[in-house]
């Protein structure tokens, strides 16, 4: 019998892009840790950072106000752990035909979840809910009724919806698995 997954964590700094991926986009800088270049869309500026500091959000995957401090961080760690050797194999052999069905499944899960786990996805969901609540308010629906209709927590926090959708990726996984896959590579002179 399998042991139930412990969904509690003390991890505060949580990456929206796993470090093992970020390290592939970084280079050692003389006398310093590895660096990569990032672009802040909101501020419109590029800057250098490290894989440890890039794409970090504090307690981003934690369920707020949960009595047992549940978090999706441990589950995301499992997906990363499963996909990391598959991605390493692709980088080493540069041949997507080597993927087994199990490898393809692990990679499809990882890609589907990766698409859904970003801060941008949270903002997209928040924006969509804001538009919907405005439309409902224009039709005379109270804020409480709108929140109930949209499945919002009493405080109207869209993060609960974001966290729920993060683990509901079955249709996206199936969609990815139904596609033909190709491996593309860029060169350092033309990244």
Locate the predicted segments by residue.
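Alpha-helical structural context detector biased toward long hydrophobic helices
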Residues: 1-191
């Amino acid at each position: 019998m399998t042991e139930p997954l412990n969904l509690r964590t003390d991890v505060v700094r949580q990456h929206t892009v796993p470090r093992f991926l970020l390290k592939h986009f970084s280079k050692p800088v003389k006398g310093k840790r590895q660096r990569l270049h990032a672009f802040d869309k909101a501020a419109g500026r590029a800057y250098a950072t490290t894989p440890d500091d890039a794409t970090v959000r504090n307690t981003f995957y934690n369920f707020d106000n949960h009595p047992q401090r549940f978090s999706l961080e441990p589950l995301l760690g499992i997906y990363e752990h499963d996909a990391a050797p598959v991605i390493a194999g692709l980088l080493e052999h540069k041949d997507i035909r080597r993927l087994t069905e199990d490898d393809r499944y692990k990679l499809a899960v990882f890609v589907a979840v990766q698409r859904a786990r970003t801060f941008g996805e949270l903002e997209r969901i928040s924006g969509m809910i804001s538009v919907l609540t405005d439309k409902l308010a224009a039709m005379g629906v109270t804020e409480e009724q709108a929140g109930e209709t949209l499945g919002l927590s009493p405080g109207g926090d869209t993060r609960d919806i974001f966290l729920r959708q993060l683990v509901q990726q079955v249709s996206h996984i199936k969609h990815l698995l139904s596609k033909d896959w190709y491996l593309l590579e860029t060169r350092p002179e033309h990244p």
